[in-house]
A protein has these predicted regions:
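N-terminal signal peptide c-region/cleavage motif recognized by signal peptidases
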Residues: 14-16
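A structural boundary/capping signal
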Residues: 18-217
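Secreted/luminal cysteine- and crosslink-motif detector
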Residues: 11-12, 100
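Sec-dependent signal peptide recognition
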Residues: 2-10
Length: 217
């Protein structure tokens, strides 16, 4: 009986910490980016809270659908930078970003929803139809499985072997970096910390450091 009570107390504490953390995030985004951004932040945190009980496939669908409503805009137009990786806070606050921002926000949301980092990767690829570089999120239900692709340019979550428009170049998650020779696992090339943009983003995310875009879209 004591063990059950202890577990219930732990669960209540976890819920309170989650609520407090979400409230802090919403308030900070609202203060920095305005009321419309605050409404997006509320919807974002509701997605995380309300999707905890879903299956992993349902979590993929909910996350992909939510973020694919945001506006695509290039880093050059938004930040006046050739390449800037926005945190989820910045992406939600602004309501727009490029393919990296869509992918990073989805990746971080899926981690919050309890999907193991070993099942997820951010994949840098060449879009053969658009003839430009692109980033997507992939999900491996099993280590040897063909991954599913979450893409801001395609609302359907398809297996990688059905995405002939994408040529994967390298992929990474929170710990590892892979060089991709085919649409599968790839070869480990070291730690993800080799990517300077990734290190900068993780530092800003950890400290909820927000930046204003140079241009309003």
């Amino acid at each position: 009986m004591k063990k059950i009570i202890f577990l219930l107390i732990c669960c209540l504490l976890a819920v309170n910490v989650f609520a407090a953390s979400s409230t802090q995030q919403i308030e900070k985004i609202t203060q920095f980016y305005g009321e419309r951004a605050g409404k997006r932040a509320i919807a974002w945190r509701a997605l995380i809270k309300d999707s905890q009980h879903l299956t992993e496939r349902q979590k993929l669908n909910a996350t992909n659908t939510f973020f694919n409503q945001f506006v695509f805009i290039s880093d050059k137009k938004l930040w006046n930078h050739k390449d800037y990786w926005a945190t989820s806070y910045e992406f939600v606050g602004i309501g727009a970003g490029d393919c990296e921002d869509f992918s990073i926000a989805k990746y971080q949301a899926l981690l919050e929803l309890g999907i193991n980092d070993n099942k997820l990767r951010l994949v840098y690829a060449k879009d053969l139809e658009l003839n430009q570089f692109h980033m997507v999120v992939t999900y491996y239900p099993k280590p040897s499985a063909i991954p599913l692709v979450l893409d801001n340019l395609n609302n359907d979550i398809l297996p990688a072997n059905q995405r002939n428009d994408l040529l994967p170049l390298y992929s990474f998650n929170g710990s590892k970096l892979w060089l991709m020779k085919k649409k599968g696992q790839g070869q480990i090339a070291g730690k993800a910390s080799r990517l300077s943009l990734w290190n900068d983003l993780r530092n800003r995310y950890q400290h909820i450091k927000l930046n204003q875009p140079r241009n309003i879209f």
